[in-house]
Structures are given as C-alpha cells and as structure tokens.
Amino acid sequence: MTAIQKPVVAKREAPKAEVNPTVSRSTQTETIKPTKERTVSVFSPPVFNFAANSFAQSVSNEYKHASPKRIKLDNSRVQVPSIVKPKQDKPRPPAIVTKPRVINIEFPNKQKSGFKLLIRPKHEPSIKKQKQGIEVLSTSNTKRITKSISVDDVEYVEKVKHAIKQVLPKPDYDDGSLGPVILRLAWHCCATYNKFTGNGGSNGSTMRFVPEITDDGNSGLDIARSALEPIKQKFPDITYSDLWTLAGKISIQEMGGPKIPWRCGRVDCIDDRYVPPNGRLPFAYKNANHIRETFGRMGFNDRETVSLLGAHGLGRCHKRFSGWEGKWTENPTSFSNDFYKVLLDEEWSLGTVPETGKEQYYNKDKSLIMLNTDIELIRDPHFLHFVKLYSQHQATFFQDFANAFGKLLELGIERDSNGNVLPKNEFY
C-alpha cells in the first residue's frame, strides 16, 4: 500500500520583539539571567507604549526572585506586542448622556450654586425592579425617591418653613425679595396639569427635566430653584415637589397674603418619561379665549381664574427672560388687591419694549405695565365682573385666592382618608 503522507502544516511563528541581551530565547525555553535592573526592554511605537510597559513590568515581576534555571515560557501570561499599523477608527456617534448635568448659576449675591439637570436619553431602556410589591422604574443616572415626608412630621415641616423664610429677603435682587420669583416657580410647576389626560401638575417635580425646564415660560426660574437647592440639601427627606410648593405658600404669606392650605407627600419622578409637553403655560400675548381655555384645562372657572391672575401684582417682568419689562404695581413685594385697582384706574396705551420689540401696555408715565392677557380681563365682560369685585373687596380676593391657589397646588394629586398621597406607579 502506498503510505498516505500527512499534510505539512506550516508552523506559525510568534511575533518577534527586541529584548534585552540578558534574556536569551530559544524556541521553547527561556534562560533568565538575573541582573541588577531585572528589566526587559521592548521596542514599540508610541501607540503601544502602555502595552510595552505592561509587558516589561509583568516579566520583571514574574522573575524578580528567580534563580538561574531553565523554565518554560508561559505565553498565556507574557505576550510580546507585535508591531502593527494602528487601525483607523470609524467615526463614532455622539456619546449618550448618562450622568446628570449640573448647571452653575450666578446668583445675585455673586455666589454660584449648582442645580442638577437630569436627562434620560429617549432610547435608554429602563430597569424594572420590585420594591414592596410596587414596580420600580429606575435608570442609572438618577436617585430613586419614592416618597416625601409624612403628613404627621410637623416638626420637620416647620424647620423647612423656617429655612425658606431665611432665603426670601434679598436686598440686591430686584425689589429686595425672592418671594415673587419663588411664587412663580410654584405657580408654573403646577400649571402644566391637564384634567383631560390626568398628567402634569406639581406631583413629580417634572421641571427638573427637559423639555419643561427649557419652556419659554419658565425662563428665569433657575434663580428660584437655585435659592431653594441648599434647603433641599439640608433637608433631603422633603421632595422637590413638596419643597417648591411649600416655598410658594410661604412666599405669599410672608408678603402679606392669605394663609394658603398645603399638605406634603408629593413624590419626585425618577426620569423624564412623564414630563408634560411644553406650551401648557398661559401665553401673555393672547386673548380671553386662550385664558379661559388654559385655566379651564386645569379645572378652574372664571372666578378662580381672575383671582389667580391677581398674583401679577407681585414681582416684575424682565426683558432678559421674557422680553417684557416692568412692574404691575407700585409695591411688587406686597400682596394686595392693587393689581385690580391699577388695572381699572389707570389709562393704558400700547407700546413696545425697545430692546426686544415685545408689545405691552404702559400707564401715562410709563412707570407701570400690563400684558395683553391682563388687559383682556377688562375687555371680557365675565372677567371684568370679578375684576371690579376684587378691586373693591380685598378680603374677598384673599379668600378666593387662597382657595384657588390651594387647589392649584393639589392638581393631579390623589390622597387617602388620612391625607397621604396615593402613589402612581409611573412615578416610581
């Protein structure tokens, strides 16, 4: 029989590398001759500097205390990097945002404060966990907050109230108080509620996320959030949604307004999946129909609507934020019915803000302003009735405002018989 010859398989040679003369290499064994330095030098182009250093270190550590003898080379542990041409990397897509972004805010007293802007990419999957029978939706870049302080923790609430009162006076900001802008924060975080869909409102503090934080109507509210952030850090058990609404209540009362009903227990959303769409806040340049539709969407009637708009007697417009400029009343840090009185008593003429081109109404000496939605309150006969009522009876205005604002703070919140907020699974 003819002998079958086995095919000759070419042996694959290991990549060569230059080594120190103190290391002599054969095909299968290696003789280590100890030297004072006990180092192995390996030639490598700059791109392989890290690999070469790692190889040299591994050989040095392997035979640091070895005596002169022949041992087998462990190729699985000691590998000499071959000299190859570096591959050209393909263009990579933009990196996914996986960490909270911190916005540094220049505060009026020249101090800087940080506010976390949490962003969850739309395509990032959620991680589902089980916690006490409730499905928990979590992401890698947010801290899960499942509940706020208890309704029975009166002492804790009082401490938070005291801390809020301390940040309100600000002599170098606007008219000397942060009360109006903090009230606006509380107002806007609630005014996204939609009674037809059931989403929006203060529960969840969704203004921490885009797109709500970038809504044009919320421009300038970073000042209020920044002022309250140290309180949140000092009292971590209270949620942002409870803190912001409580701060709105305290601001009204500290500026001489009525006592506002408020209860704790709101939760904070863990990501942006339940952020309402932008455009739900009232637009100041629109007409009475827009006002009625916007407030009607939240569940308010004409009387409640006019009473809530009386808060325009506080604070002022800033052209750097909204494009409008000026104050509504002579005492913008004092809660009263002056807004209605000024609206009826002054003569208003349409003008523009020179720097922005935005239209607004001025009184004769241009010391006070009104927006188009304000003027609509005296154009619409149904709204005008309540404007006249509140201009003549401040006590009635205070009572109606307290009821309407308390209702605003509770939009979208369900409670049990003990006052505890009933959890919504989508917030957890």
Curated annotation (Swiss-Prot):
Protein EC: 1.11.1.-
Keyword terms of this UniProt record: Heme, Iron, Metal-binding, Oxidoreductase, Peroxidase
Active site: H188, W328
Superkingdom, natural source: Eukaryota
Disordered, as annotated region: 1-33
Residues that coordinate or bind heme b: H312
Cofactors: heme b
Pfam families per UniProt: peroxidase (PF00141)
Composition bias type Polar residues, residue spans: 21-32
Cofactor note as given: Binds 1 heme b (iron(II)-protoporphyrin IX) group per subunit.
Enzyme class, broadest EC rank: oxidoreductase
Keyword Acetylation applies: no
Residue numbers marked as site, Transition state stabilizer: R184
GO terms, biological process: cellular response to oxidative stress; hydrogen peroxide catabolic process; response to reactive oxygen species
One example GO MF annotation: heme binding
Function per UniProt: Destroys radicals which are normally produced within the cells and which are toxic to biological systems.
Family, per entry: Belongs to the peroxidase family. Cytochrome c peroxidase subfamily.
UniProt-recorded name of the protein: Putative heme-binding peroxidase
Species this protein is from: Debaryomyces hansenii (strain ATCC 36239 / CBS 767 / BCRC 21394 / JCM 1990 / NBRC 0083 / IGC 2968) (Yeast)
Lineage, uppermost ranks: Eukaryota, Fungi, Dikarya, Ascomycota, Saccharomycotina
